[in-house]
């Protein structure tokens, strides 16, 4: 059994070698010749999986180590009798922590408290729900917009997108990309929406580039609209609008979900799905794969305020470390993908062990996802 895996999927070689012969290949472009005798293909979001790639090939199963699936023609795979699995929620925590890192940086730079801001969350799936929970743990007001869930009658106080635009100081997008249909998200943030945002609002896109109309956004910024922008995703990736990058406050190369934990979850989820598909079901404990974190433990004295939270968050991950490298190489062919391929190891907040002498601080840090314990001062 021959299994092709994206060379940038951590732990893929070791895990899938339990099931067959493994060959690691580039994800963009996939070397087509390798598909001629392969039984399974494991990809990431950079690989377009459709009939033109797999038609006439012996592939029996495709796995994508990503939460999103808009790069996969699922209808064609089903018609062709090819098994398929994604990894829903695998990088949700990573994206939430990316958003927090960005907001805490902007709050420090611009001198505001997040408690004084209302956050509108567009898309309340794996990422949006976790983001809501962590924001509300901090006492920050959230407004939710998710028309598919609202129409299904899912639990939640869902508002219209117009309401979020009217009332939110921060608008963050966490939707799939739907190019048509009743829940179309292509250019959901169009010129009209962008112009309607509150003065001084913060716009964040960490889902799919085309959810925000990049041309319209650049037009508004060039005209001097007072708006802070965080973009991790771009229309036309791996190409991006260099002029837009110059205008945004934070720009990164589609790495919001790139924690070691998130990548490992993605790999293990598709590994488990494929093992079940071939009748040799196996399960993997994530903590058996992950290395020891960089920081063993730290001690926190007193209550948890915003500056302290910012220091803890940025100790684990400071978004500026990914903004600067992109600005240096933007516009140079191939460099966007190179930044992603050679991405520095990044951990999640759970990797940081925090000893608190304040019980409320320990409790709150645990709710936020840190590995925190309370040890009273003596």
Swiss-Prot record:
CDD domains found in the cross-reference section: ErythrP_dh
Database matches in InterPro entries: D-isomer_2_OHA_DH_cat_dom, D-isomer_DH_CS, D-isomer_DH_CS1, D-isomer_DH_NAD-bd, Erythronate-4-P_DHase, Erythronate-4-P_DHase_dimer, NAD(P)-bd_dom_sf, PdxB_dimer_sf
The keyword rRNA-binding belongs to this UniProt entry's keyword annotation: no
Reaction it catalyzes: 4-phospho-D-erythronate + NAD(+) = (R)-3-hydroxy-2-oxo-4-phosphooxybutanoate + NADH + H(+)
GO CC terms in record: cytosol
Binding residues for NAD(+): 146, 175, 232, 257
Gene3D superfamilies (UniProt xref): 3.30.1370.170, NAD(P)-binding Rossmann-like Domain
One Pfam family cited in the UniProt record for this chain: 2-Hacid_dh_C
Major subcellular location class: cytoplasm
Residues given in the record as substrate binding sites: 45, 66, 258
Keywords: Cytoplasm, NAD, Oxidoreductase, Pyridoxine biosynthesis
EC identifiers of the protein: 1.1.1.290
Record-level GO BP terms: 'de novo' pyridoxal 5'-phosphate biosynthetic process; pyridoxine biosynthetic process
Gene Ontology MF, one: protein dimerization activity
Pathway(s) of this molecule: Cofactor biosynthesis; pyridoxine 5'-phosphate biosynthesis; pyridoxine 5'-phosphate from D-erythrose 4-phosphate: step 2/5
Cell compartments where the protein resides: Cytoplasm
Source taxon at top rank: Bacteria
Active site per UniProt: 208, 237, 254 (proton donor)
Top EC category: oxidoreductase
Assembly with partners or alone: Homodimer.
Function: Catalyzes the oxidation of erythronate-4-phosphate to 3-hydroxy-2-oxo-4-phosphonooxybutanoate.
Protein family membership: Belongs to the D-isomer specific 2-hydroxyacid dehydrogenase family. PdxB subfamily.
Protein's name according to its UniProt entry: Erythronate-4-phosphate dehydrogenase
Upper classification of the organism: Bacteria, Pseudomonadati, Pseudomonadota, Gammaproteobacteria, Enterobacterales
């Amino acid at each position: 059994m021959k299994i092709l895996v994206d060379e940038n999927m951590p732990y893929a070689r070791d895990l899938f070698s339990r099931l067959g012969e493994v060959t690691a290949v580039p994800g963009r472009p996939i070397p087509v010749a390798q598909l001629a005798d392969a039984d399974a293909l494991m990809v990431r979001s950079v690989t377009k999986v459709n009939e033109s790639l797999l038609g006439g090939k012996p592939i029996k199963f495709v796995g994508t180590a990503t939460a999103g699936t808009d790069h996969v023609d699922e209808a064609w795979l089903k018609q062709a009798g090819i098994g398929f699995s994604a990894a829903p929620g695998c990088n949700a925590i990573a994206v939430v922590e990316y958003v927090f890192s960005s907001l805490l940086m902007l709050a420090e730079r611009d001198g505001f408290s997040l408690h004084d801001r209302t956050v509108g969350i567009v898309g309340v799936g794996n990422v949006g729900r976790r983001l809501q929970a962590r924001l509300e743990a901090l006492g920050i007001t959230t407004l939710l917009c998710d028309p598919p869930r609202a129409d299904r009658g899912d639990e939640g106080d869902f508002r219209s997108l117009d309401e979020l635009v009217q009332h939110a100081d921060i608008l963050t997008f966490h939707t799939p990309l739907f190019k048509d249909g009743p829940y179309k998200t292509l250019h959901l943030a169009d010129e009209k929406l962008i112009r309607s945002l509150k003065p001084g609002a913060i716009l964040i896109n960490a889902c799919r580039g085309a959810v925000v109309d990049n041309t319209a956004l650049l037009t508004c910024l060039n005209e001097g609209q007072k708006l802070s922008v965080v973009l991790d995703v771009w229309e036309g990736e791996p190409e991006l609008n260099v002029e837009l990058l110059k205008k945004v406050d934070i720009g990164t190369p589609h790495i919001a979900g790139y924690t070691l934990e998130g990548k490992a979850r993605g790999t293990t989820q598709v590994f488990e799905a494929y093992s079940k598909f071939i009748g040799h079901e196996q399960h993997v404990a994530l903590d058996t794969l992950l290395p020891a974190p960089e920081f063993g433990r730290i001690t926190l004295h007193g209550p948890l305020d915003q500056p302290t939270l910012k220091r803890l968050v940025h100790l684990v991950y400071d978004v500026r470390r990914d903004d600067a490298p992109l600005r240096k190489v933007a516009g140079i062919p191939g460099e966007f993908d190179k930044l992603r391929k050679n991405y520095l190891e990044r951990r999640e907040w759970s990797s940081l062990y925090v000893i608190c002498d304040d019980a409320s601080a320990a409790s709150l840090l645990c709710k936020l996802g840190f590995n925190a314990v309370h040890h009273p001062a003596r």
